[in-house]
């Protein structure tokens, strides 16, 4: 396990303890171990090093004492800042964006997510090439290497730009396929689990699968970004069939490259009928909701049903504090490891879904037996009758099926 020193850059209103914990958790998720931390309140960014020169001395002395070779910052550094810091410290420097991209690369399991991570890495790398090649040229001796270095730089830049175009085209092709797949499940109620990292989304999905489904579990661990790829499972809630999608968690301070890496998740959210916003009730409720609300506003989720799920209530010292949190949406308080709580969540979901159902009477000709089979399989039929031409059924249908089969309604 690689030992590192973490550097936390604080704004005047930041909570130092939370910032330290978040970066330490990310380092742990990446497979490293934070052996010390250095913090500095920065009101004006040093364009050369981001932090002050005095802090650099402190970091250098600490690294020498602990024999640490890697420093990790919790901010995104410019190409010149990365270069200057490594030159000054003679140590490897990793910034916030590079750290998270590394975690994403470790945890990407589908073709789409791997392509997205590669694209984000290339877009992150492109503006930094100049400084990297300058550094390599100096290591090689400087004089006599400038021409070849510049040629190599231009060749590498063109190669990266070519790879970016190729990846963007491949991702567009994947999106076309996904659009077709979404259409194939238009008549199933689609629900997405969204929330902060490590809030318990995968635990909820796994619990729901155990109680109401039969497919494999989703990887779940006490790590930030344990889920990178979106994972969709089908569930049967008492003849109400739904898909439930687990997504990578939200987090603050994401660069454009990292936001692009979230597109898989964000696109699934857009095509959902309902969002389950999962909140870790034991940790900074206001901060989580602020991050989630901001992200949902940015992706324009439209008019969707939303249930706020306050999870980990078993870890809350004062349960009344969470229950007093007022939202304009439905809310429920659970511990995702308790089956009874998950059944209560299922009941709440079904209640909200049913509010969108309409009771109808349909006449289905005998020649359209497949349509009748569909409703018999997927709905509770309230009443059945027959005439000389077909079957008459009464039932409650969802909005999608109401629109699709409106011609059968009498």
Question: Across the structure, where does each feature detected by a protein language model lie?
Answer:
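N-terminal accessory targeting/assembly segments
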Residues: 1-102, 409
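Conserved beta-strand segments of the P-loop GTPase G domain that flank and frequently precede/overlap
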Residues: 6-10, 37-40, 72-74, 276-280, ...
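Flexible beta-alpha connector loops of hexameric P-loop NTPases
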Residues: 11-14, 47-48, 107, 152, ...
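Conserved C-terminal guanine-recognition region of P-loop GTPase G domains, centered on the G4
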Residues: 22-26, 60-61, 77, 82-87, ...
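Canonical P-loop GTPase G-domain recognition
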Residues: 92-98, 102-106, 112-141, 302-307, ...
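Alpha-helical coiled-coil heptad-repeat register
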Residues: 116, 123-126, 130-133, 154, ...
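Conserved G1/Walker A P-loop phosphate-binding module
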Residues: 139-256, 269
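NTP-binding/hydrolysis catalytic cores, primarily Walker-type P-loop NTPases
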Residues: 355-410
């Amino acid at each position: 396990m690689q030992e590192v020193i973490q550097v936390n850059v604080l704004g005047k209103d930041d909570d130092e303890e939370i910032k330290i914990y978040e970066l330490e958790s990310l380092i742990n998720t990446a497979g490293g171990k934070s052996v010390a931390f250095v913090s500095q309140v920065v009101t004006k960014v040093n364009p050369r090093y981001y932090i002050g020169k005095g802090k650099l001395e402190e970091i250098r002395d600490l690294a020498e004492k602990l024999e640490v070779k890697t420093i990790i910052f919790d901010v995104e550094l410019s190409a010149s800042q990365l270069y200057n810091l490594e030159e000054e410290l003679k140590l490897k420097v990793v910034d916030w964006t590079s750290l998270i991209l590394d975690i994403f690369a470790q945890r990407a399991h589908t073709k789409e997510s791997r392509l997205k991570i590669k694209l984000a890495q290339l877009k992150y790398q492109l503006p930094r090439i100049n400084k990297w090649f300058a550094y390599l040229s100096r290591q090689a001796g400087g004089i006599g290497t400038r021409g070849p270095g510049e040629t190599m730089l231009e060749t590498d830049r063109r190669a990266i730009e070519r790879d970016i175009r190729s990846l963007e085209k491949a991702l567009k092709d994947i999106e076309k396929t996904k659009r077709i797949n979404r259409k194939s499940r238009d008549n199933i109620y689609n629900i997405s689990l969204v929330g902060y990292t490590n809030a318990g989304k995968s635990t909820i999905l796994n619990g729901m699968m155990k109680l109401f489904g039969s497919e494999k579990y989703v990887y779940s661990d006490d790590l930030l970004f344990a889920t990178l790829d979106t994972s969709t499972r089908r569930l049967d809630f008492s003849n109400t069939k739904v898909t439930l999608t687990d997504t990578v968690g939200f987090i603050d301070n994401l660069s454009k490259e990292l936001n692009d890496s979230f597109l898989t998740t964000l696109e699934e959210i857009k095509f959902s009928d309902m969002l389950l916003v999962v909140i870790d009730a034991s940790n900074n409720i206001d901060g989580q909701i602020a991050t989630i609300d901001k992200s949902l506003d940015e992706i324009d989720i439209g008019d969707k049903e939303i249930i706020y799920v306050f999870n980990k209530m078993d870890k809350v010292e004062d349960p009344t504090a969470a229950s007093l949190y007022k939202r304009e949406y439905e809310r429920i308080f659970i511990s995702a490891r308790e089956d009874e709580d998950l059944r209560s969540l299922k009941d709440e979901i079904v209640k909200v879904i049913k509010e969108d159902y309409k009771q109808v009477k349909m006449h289905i000709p005998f020649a359209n037996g497949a349509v009748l089979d569909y409703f018999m399989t997927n709905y509770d039929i309230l009443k059945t009758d027959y005439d000389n031409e077909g079957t008459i059924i009464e039932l409650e249908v969802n909005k999608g099926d109401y629109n699709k089969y409106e011609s059968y309604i009498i």
